[in-house]
């Protein structure tokens, strides 16, 4: 079996003809005419550089009121929702620049320009390397995530079920566990350490054609 991945900037609604078999999309999982299977990405982290954490300093939710908050323009209420959930006055916040890619937010946070609110799966490498830290320690679940989407008719294909099972395994297997046969054949595990450019934007679609 061979897989071909193509990156699109906007989500596909599957109500119109398309040239791919399935897509990995970021959102609420409710796209028209699509069968959506959740993969990863709901776990969310608040991140910044260690230098910014120590300089402000950042230790409590209230401390974020004096930090520049980096925003995703296609998830515009992320910070507001978090602040309201933590009893903070959003009118006192310093909402900073907006970006259309999580990868840009991550790079800005690493460079010390502000604090980002991002899917944890996208910053695992930076957290491990110490270029980003979680100043508040606590993570939380977002209603948004990455989903494998396809027209319902395609989901009955054996090749689709194989790829769906592989992706779900990649997103859930414990560190060091063996990936299934499709990965051993050379496809790799695209979600164990997701490349920022491949799935770092709210509306980005990573579409795949499958040949078996």
Enumerate the language-model features and the residues they cover.
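Flexible hinge/capping segments at coil-to-helix
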Residues: 32-69
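C-terminal effector-binding regulatory domain of bacterial HTH transcription factors
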Residues: 121-125, 129, 139-212
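Secondary-structure junction motif
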Residues: 69-86
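Alpha-to-beta junction loops
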Residues: 18-23, 44, 109-115
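Central regulatory/effector-binding core of bacterial HTH transcription factors
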Residues: 1-31, 181-195, 209-212
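Ligand-binding "clamshell"
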Residues: 31-36, 40, 126-136
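A local structural motif
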Residues: 1-4, 87-96
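Hydrophobic hinge/microswitch elements
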Residues: 91-134, 141-142, 156
